[in-house]
């Protein structure tokens, strides 16, 4: 399972002109399930993402996770958006292949599991809409962007 995480000052996702999720400072996570992924990969990826230290401490060092973004125990927002194109195979030709991505059914199941687990573990979770054409806007803070991956079993 893959997550492209970005530290943001704010982010929003809309579907057909309707806002489905919006956060202030926090993390925007573009999430993708790969063939062979299970709930175990989703849970490991979420645990890594929530504890990944990408926010600056009082000394300006990247040392704080989204769960304690300000160093005083206050969490930042988490906006989770499905994006199957993260699993694209771009090694040959000029058209990406999406064979490495999970099937739509498995992708939806794992995305929904990821979101449910995120909501159980983090107080500020917003989402996009699985399978929809979405418009994602963000103000990247840094910019700070990381690619996290837990390989399929």
UniProtKB/Swiss-Prot annotation:
Primary location: cytoplasm
MF GO annotations: D-tyrosyl-tRNA(Tyr) deacylase activity; Gly-tRNA(Ala) deacylase activity; Ser(Gly)-tRNA(Ala) hydrolase activity; tRNA binding
Keyword tags: Cytoplasm, Hydrolase, RNA-binding, tRNA-binding
The protein's enzyme class: hydrolase
Placement of sequence motif Gly-cisPro motif, important for rejection of L-amino acids: 142-143
One GO BP: D-amino acid catabolic process
Stored Pfam families: Tyr_Deacylase
Domain of life of the native organism: Bacteria
Catalytic activities: glycyl-tRNA(Ala) + H2O = tRNA(Ala) + glycine + H(+); a D-aminoacyl-tRNA + H2O = a tRNA + a D-alpha-amino acid + H(+)
Any one annotated GO CC term: cytoplasm
Family to which this protein belongs: Belongs to the DTD family.
Function of the molecule: An aminoacyl-tRNA editing enzyme that deacylates mischarged D-aminoacyl-tRNAs. Also deacylates mischarged glycyl-tRNA(Ala), protecting cells against glycine mischarging by AlaRS. Acts via tRNA-based rather than protein-based catalysis; rejects L-amino acids rather than detecting D-amino acids in the active site. By recycling D-aminoacyl-tRNA to D-amino acids and free tRNA molecules, this enzyme counteracts the toxicity associated with the formation of D-aminoacyl-tRNA entities in vivo and helps enforce protein L-homochirality.
Domain topic, free-text comment: A Gly-cisPro motif from one monomer fits into the active site of the other monomer to allow specific chiral rejection of L-amino acids.
Protein name: D-aminoacyl-tRNA deacylase
Highest classification ranks of the organism: Bacteria, Pseudomonadati, Pseudomonadota, Betaproteobacteria, Burkholderiales
